[in-house]
């Protein structure tokens, strides 16, 4: 089954558009890790003004994560992954239910923001742009102290609906094939 943290800590992301700062707290609400927080990005450059509903329900566009409070689970120090998953770095955890499901999107995670800058909608943490940095080692130590159970995301993005004219039509599932993360030896799937 899934490894949901029990009685764990929390992650708080605050920012504007699609970037900001993240702080971690332990189960007692005490800040752990860098007291100034960690820089984060979500989505591709140029997606800062995408409204909440589109962030929630438009997979495959590289939009930022929608604002909200979600479960954090299935943390994995998987080491380097190949090809399209290289950008995850050496560790990741799912955000949302199941395999990182938020609205109509899946594969939503928190991971190191490996260069180039930006993610497909995950929360990418700025720890130097490559795996194995001192910043990353400190972050992972703080992660284990926090044992985060929830993440609260607030990019202050505009609310409002979708402008149907400029959007391509979607199939019932145009996301990358989903794979269950609770199979032994499975790798995370790229976000959509």
What spans do the regions from the language model cover?
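Gly/Pro-biased beta-strand-loop elements
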Residues: 1-108
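Secretion-targeting segments and adjacent low-complexity export tracts
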Residues: 1-8, 181, 187-192
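Exported/periplasmic cell-wall-interacting domains
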Residues: 76-188
């Amino acid at each position: 089954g899934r490894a949901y943290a029990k009685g764990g800590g929390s992650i708080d992301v605050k920012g504007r558009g699609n970037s900001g700062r993240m702080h971690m707290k332990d189960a007692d609400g005490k800040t752990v890790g860098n007291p100034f927080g960690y820089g984060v990005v979500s989505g591709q450059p140029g997606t800062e003004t995408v409204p909440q509903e589109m962030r929630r329900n438009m997979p495959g566009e590289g939009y930022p994560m929608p604002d909200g409070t979600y479960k954090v689970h299935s943390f994995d120090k998987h080491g380097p992954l190949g090809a399209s998953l290289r950008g995850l770095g050496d560790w990741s955890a799912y955000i949302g239910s199941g395999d990182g499901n938020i609205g109509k999107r899946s594969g939503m995670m928190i991971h190191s923001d490996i260069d180039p800058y930006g993610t497909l909608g995950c929360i990418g943490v700025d720890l130097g742009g490559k795996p194995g940095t001192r910043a990353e080692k400190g972050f992972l130590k703080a992660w284990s102290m926090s044992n985060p159970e929830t993440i609260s995301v607030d990019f202050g993005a505009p609310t409002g609906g979708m402008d149907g004219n400029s959007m391509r039509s979607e199939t019932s599932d145009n996301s990358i094939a989903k794979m269950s993360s609770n199979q032994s030896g499975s790798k995370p799937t790229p976000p959509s």
